[in-house]
A protein has these predicted regions:
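Small/aliphatic-rich secondary-structure junction motif
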Residues: 3-52, 78
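Solvent-exposed polar/charged
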Residues: 24-27, 100, 131
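Conserved beta-strand positions in the Rossmann-like core of class I SAM-dependent methyltransferases
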Residues: 34, 83, 138
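Short beta->alpha linker loops
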Residues: 51, 86-90, 112
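A short acidic, glycine-rich active-site loop
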Residues: 52-66
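Structural beta-alpha unit
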Residues: 73-107
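Glycine-rich, Arg-bearing micro-motifs that act as flexible, cationic patches
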Residues: 106-131
Length: 141
């Protein structure tokens, strides 16, 4: 039924619960698992300090790489091979773009990973993914 599963992670407890569900589904269904981490620098983080901004970006990118490595290990320990994708941009759009590009049959995301102000202004990542996805979306609480 679900041959390709895409899951978005950001290191939060909710995204790790979503990953656990995605790993178990991939194992039970012998599905391909693709784990996406999108490095997101909120507009409030931008400044005129180019070197400082680059330093922040590099730190966030390194956190993303480390998070994906942990996710791949977690999947491997459950007997599932996970392919990882590291992107830069807006998280919901990165997850949606990857799902579309990969021809995903299912997207798995955690609920409520954003802060209160950002959620108020833009909605949560899970809400946007569920709203605009071309395939079924599982939102894990």
């Amino acid at each position: 039924m679900y041959q390709k599963i895409v899951t978005g992670v950001d290191g939060s407890p909710n995204s790790l619960r979503a990953l656990e569900h995605a790993v178990q589904l991939a194992k039970q269904l012998s599905s391909e698992l693709i784990v996406v981490y999108v490095v997101h620098i909120p507009i409030t983080s931008y400044s005129y300090d180019v070197l400082g901004s680059l330093e922040v970006f590099n730190k966030l990118e390194e956190e993303g790489k480390q998070s994906l490595a942990k996710c791949a290990t977690m999947a491997s320990e459950a007997g599932v091979t996970a392919r990882t994708v590291l992107l830069t941009g807006e998280p919901a759009q990165g997850i949606l773009d990857t799902a579309g590009k990969e021809g995903a049959d299912l997207v798995v995301v955690g609920s409520r990973g954003t802060g209160t102000l950002e959620r108020l202004l833009m909605g949560s990542v899970s809400e946007r993914v569920a709203r605009f996805s071309k395939c079924p979306v599982l939102v894990v609480k």
